[in-house]
């Protein structure tokens, strides 16, 4: 297959996927209320839900609502936090958990409608943190380490230093990356905010399928680091990349 044919087939496949997803304005997406946790996995996800302090770029927004409608995001124009200083409908954090090797991994993901401002324009950005604990079924379970997405790499801390904890919650900051202007995560001693948590399993079928099929990577070269981190196939790879032990 020559290059022209390959590009045409790639564009056709992209259009087919996008046709299955309904996109709506980023500030009209309704978040899921945080359900009362029932399982050990859900209780641990709520217990260890991080605090997030936003010092640069967009605040977290819901990426999908119950009927499967997905955020269309924002062009990377204007100020870094322009038109994305927080949704009037409420914010959201997503999580998915599983055993990885001999540790329990809780992956948290925040959706930002604007990825890069100025000349690096890009819609959409997912910020991700993995909290590693010993066992979600234990009443006195313990954080063993935390991994943060950090550009192309992961920034890890195992064990986590106490100054970056507020009880059972790690304190994170979304700040301006030094190499080029885009939000990144780092540990902080400052108190942040929490968002309503919805786990991957608690999402409606429509919402889960929409997040799995939505196009969050507008670049020609596709990479899993820009895809929805919790979806099948990407979740497992991200856990492997984030392993800190």
Curated annotation (Swiss-Prot):
Keywords: Glycoprotein, Secreted, Signal, Virulence
Glycan-bearing residues: 140
Motif (Hepta-peptide GHRHDWE motif): 121-127
Principal location: secreted
Domain of life: Eukaryota
Keyword NAD: no
Entry-linked InterPro entries: NPP1
Cellular component terms (Gene Ontology): extracellular region
Signal peptide: 1-19
Subcellular location: Secreted
Function: Secreted effector that contributes strongly to virulence during infection by P.capsici.
Domain-level remarks: Key residues/motif important for the effector activities are degenerated in most NLPs, including the nlp24 peptide consisting of the conserved region I (11-aa immunogenic part) and conserved region II (the heptapeptide GHRHDWE motif) that is important for phytotoxic activity.
Assigned protein family: Belongs to the Necrosis inducing protein (NPP1) family.
Descriptive protein name: NLP effector protein Pc118551
Native source species: Phytophthora capsici
């Amino acid at each position: 297959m020559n290059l022209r044919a390959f590009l045409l087939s790639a564009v056709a496949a992209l259009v087919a996927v996008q046709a299955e997803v309904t996109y709506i304005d980023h500030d009209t997406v309704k978040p899921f209320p945080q359900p009362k946790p029932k399982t050990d996995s859900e209780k641990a996800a709520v217990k260890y839900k991080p605090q997030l302090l936003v010092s640069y770029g967009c605040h977290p927004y819901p990426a999908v609502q119950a009927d499967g409608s997905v955020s269309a995001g924002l062009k990377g124009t204007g100020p870094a936090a322009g038109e994305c200083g927080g949704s009037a409908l409420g914010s959201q954090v997503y999580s998915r958990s599983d055993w990885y090797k001999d540790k329990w991994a809780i992956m948290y993901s925040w959706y930002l409608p604007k990825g890069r401002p100025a000349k690096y324009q890009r819609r959409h950005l997912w910020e991700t943190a993995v909290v590693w604990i010993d066992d979600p079924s234990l009443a006195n379970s313990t954080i063993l380490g935390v991994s943060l997405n950090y550009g192309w790499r992961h920034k890890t801390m195992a064990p986590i230093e106490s100054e970056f904890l507020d009880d059972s919650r790690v304190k994170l900051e979304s700040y301006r990356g030094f190499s080029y202007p885009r939000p990144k995560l780092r540990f902080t001693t400052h108190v942040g905010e929490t968002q309503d948590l919805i786990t991957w399993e608690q999402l409606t079928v429509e919402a889960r399928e929409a997040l799995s099929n939505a196009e969050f990577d507008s670049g020609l070269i596709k990479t899993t680091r820009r895809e929805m981190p919790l979806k099948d196939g990407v979740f497992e790879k991200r856990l492997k990349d984030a392993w800190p032990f």
